[in-house]
Design a protein with these regions (language model features):
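Acyl-donor (CoA/ACP) binding surface of acyl/acetyltransferases
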Residues: 1-18, 63-174
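Short, P/G- and charge-enriched loop/turn segments at secondary-structure junctions
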Residues: 46-48, 147-148
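Residues forming the ATP-binding cleft of Hanks-type serine/threonine protein kinase domains
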Residues: 23
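Structural motif
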Residues: 26-27, 54, 113, 136
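Conserved GNAT-fold acetyl-CoA-binding loop/helix
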Residues: 27-46
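Hydrophobic pocket/interface hotspot
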Residues: 19-20, 28, 43, 83
Length: 174
């Protein structure tokens, strides 16, 4: 799946070192809910355990063929899936790459997988992510108080949803 300079492709074993580096980067993991630090051996086990599963899609975001982040869909079931994204390379942030990659993933979700809706959770303090999600057409549906634990503290999260029809009207011609 490709737009002008942005491409998303399936996550491969040789992407493990980038994922580990990106997730362990303090500039990226403030709002991530991982058991940190990630290590390559455990991530390799994760990769082999999840390879070939049809209830998830893990991908790499490339900009001009350079891997710059991860994106995907989890819990693909009954016409729904949970979206995630981390742009790992700081020098590529703020350039619209995350939006382009998100649009590509959502096109795949709605056109190829025939999903009805894609949802996500984001912490209330993660303002840059909320701006991205709203630019892509996600709608903030509710506040879930104390719904996750991040670094030993309960955190509030927003629940966002985008339906196939909402995506089509927001992203015409993209």
């Amino acid at each position: 799946m490709r737009s002008e300079n942005v491409n998303i492709r399936p996550f491969m074993e040789n992407d493990i070192s980038n994922k580990v580096r990106w997730i362990n980067d303090c500039g990226n993991n403030r709002f991530l809910h991982y058991d940190l630090p990630l290590d390559e051996d455990k991530t390799r086990v994760w990769f082999h355990k999840n390879k070939g599963r049809t209830d998830r899609y893990d991908a790499i975001i490339e900009y001009d063929s350079i891997p710059v982040g991860i994106i995907g869909l989890l819990s693909i079931v009954d016409g729904r899936a949970e979206y995630y994204i981390t742009l790992g390379e700081s020098q590529y942030k703020g350039k619209g790459i995350a939006r382009d990659a998100s649009v590509l993933l959502l096109k795949y979700a709605f056109d190829e997988l025939k999903l009805r809706e894609v949802y996500l959770y984001t912490e209330v303090d993660n303002i840059p992510a909320q701006k991205l999600f709203e630019k892509c057409g996600f709608v903030k549906y509710r506040l879930d108080r104390n719904s996750a634990v991040n670094r030993g503290q309960f955190v509030d999260r927003y629940y966002y949803v985008i339906t196939a029809s909402e995506f089509g009207s927001v992203n015409k011609g993209k």
